Amino acid sequence: MHKPQSFFHLHLISDATGETLLAAGRAAAAQYKNARAIEHIYPLVRTEKQLEKVFASIDEEPGIVLYTIVDQKLARQVDERCQAMGLPCVSVLEPVLAVFQSYLGTPAGRRVGAQHVLDAEYFRRIDALNFTMEHDDGQLPHNVEEADIVLVGVSRTSKTPTSIYLANRGIKTANVPIVLDAPLPEPLLNAKRPLVVGLIASAERISQVRQNRLLGASHVDFDAYVDRAEIARELAYARQLCNRHNWPVIDVTRRSIEETAAAILALRGKSW
């Protein structure tokens, strides 16, 4: 008999694009078939202020923390904060750098993003990541016209991780939440340039993810937030909005982030 699949939060903090962390985290998570990692990616974290925002998010959804941060002061802060919160924390590159240093006899150069070639493509990706982080969860709706892609959907339909995945490929991606009976921002409805794509999932999947998100946390509308009938209403409203504006819809229930991104890029290829 199969054990029911459980969920855990995997927080990935990087001072560059986060691709190294993502690969390492997924390689480790793949060894645990009955535990699904809910990924939270924080790229371009290079200041204490940015780190504060990261830990505010981690505090809401505690889990495993992996990081690659060159600045040793920031790295120590990550270790100290995780220790204070009782969270497991690993610097992914530090053990590898220690081996290199021991063998080569010289310390590492400590260059941010040194594994990436600093060419035009790299800077395009960094620009896209900056844009995507600034336009997460409906932020700065007034300049959504500058996006290449806008993802819309109800809470917990993988909008943010999919946005970051696309940004890592140099695509400026904004995402906007759909809230039951609430209108969408006017700038989005009037936008001509970006491809707008709706993301949905089954009510069962969304309820499961939301319940896991709220474990150990208080939420005034807990019952409504995880109620499948209520979620079905949210999804019906989301479909209605997408149909009204002729936006394509992708069901992410059984798709990985990569598969969802591939489907979006296929739509983008048709529209450009």
Swiss-Prot record:
Give the organism, scientific name: Chelativorans sp. (strain BNC1)
PANTHER family per UniProt: PYRUVATE, PHOSPHATE DIKINASE REGULATORY PROTEIN 1, CHLOROPLASTIC (PTHR31756:SF3)
Q: What is this protein called?
A: Putative pyruvate, phosphate dikinase regulatory protein
Q: What does this protein do?
A: Bifunctional serine/threonine kinase and phosphorylase involved in the regulation of the pyruvate, phosphate dikinase (PPDK) by catalyzing its phosphorylation/dephosphorylation.
Q: What class of enzyme is it?
A: transferase
Q: Which superkingdom heads the taxonomic lineage of this protein's source? A: Bacteria
**At which positions is ADP bound?**
153-160
Catalytic activity of the protein: N(tele)-phospho-L-histidyl/L-threonyl-[pyruvate, phosphate dikinase] + ADP = N(tele)-phospho-L-histidyl/O-phospho-L-threonyl-[pyruvate, phosphate dikinase] + AMP + H(+); N(tele)-phospho-L-histidyl/O-phospho-L-threonyl-[pyruvate, phosphate dikinase] + phosphate + H(+) = N(tele)-phospho-L-histidyl/L-threonyl-[pyruvate, phosphate dikinase] + diphosphate
Q: Per the UniProt record, which EC number(s) apply here?
A: 2.7.11.32, 2.7.4.27
**NCBIfam families hit by this protein:** PRK05339.1
UniProt KW keywords? Kinase, Nucleotide-binding, Serine/threonine-protein kinase, Transferase
Which cysteines share a disulfide bond? none
Task: Please list the GO terms describing molecular function.
Answer: ADP binding; ATP binding; phosphotransferase activity, phosphate group as acceptor; protein serine/threonine kinase activity
Q: What are the TM regions of this chain, as residue ranges?
A: none
| Protein family (similarity comment) | Belongs to the pyruvate, phosphate/water dikinase regulatory protein family. PDRP subfamily.
